[in-house]
Amino acid sequence: MKNKFKSVAESFFRIFIVRYFFRMLIKLGSGCGRVWTFAKVRALVDIPKGSNCHWSVVFKYPENIHFSGRVMLSPGCVIGAMSPVSFGNEVRLSQGVHLETASLDVNGDLPYKHIAKPITIGDGVWIGAHSIILGGVSIGKNSVIGAGVVVSKSIPENSIVVGPGFRFIERKEKY
């Protein structure tokens, strides 16, 4: 109970500081978008030291995003984490990559309800530009996802996946 209270208190403090800082930036005028985004990312998402995170990266539900080690998040990435998203060490997301844990339950009544499944990305994974990773997917360590691939099912370790047909082109040799 004590740890939960501490966690809630820390989150509240971070959000309070970010909002206060945001008001200060509004007073400063235009051109402060980068500073605001950097402050927002650092306050709401616990990114490990040595990581690179472009200021244009969008985090939805940042409390569900967990990093195990260094990551590189390129411009235009969107991480929608209604359910947990876990990153391994030395993970690279190229420009415009989307990770989305939520989808709609179209079998139910209107309005459709959101359902969310976790995403797990292993160590040493490289995801190519403009790829989309959907909920319920686990990407094994040392895998490479080519540009523009929509990943809707799990990928084993040491795999290379390319093309719109989700083709495994080869298994990488272990290091």
Regions found by a protein language model. Give the residues of each.
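Short-chain dehydrogenase/reductase
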Residues: 52, 72, 126, 144, ...
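Terminal amphipathic alpha-helical/low-complexity segments used for targeting or macromolecular assembly
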Residues: 1-44, 48-50, 90, 124, ...
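Flexible, glycine/small-residue-enriched loop-and-beta-strand segment within the central core
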Residues: 56-67, 72-138, 164-166, 170-175
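Extracytoplasmic/secreted proteins and extracellular or luminal domains
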Residues: 43-44, 63, 117, 151
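Beta-rich strand-turn-strand
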Residues: 129-153
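Short, functionally important structural connectors and interaction interfaces within domains
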Residues: 39, 49-51, 57-59, 147
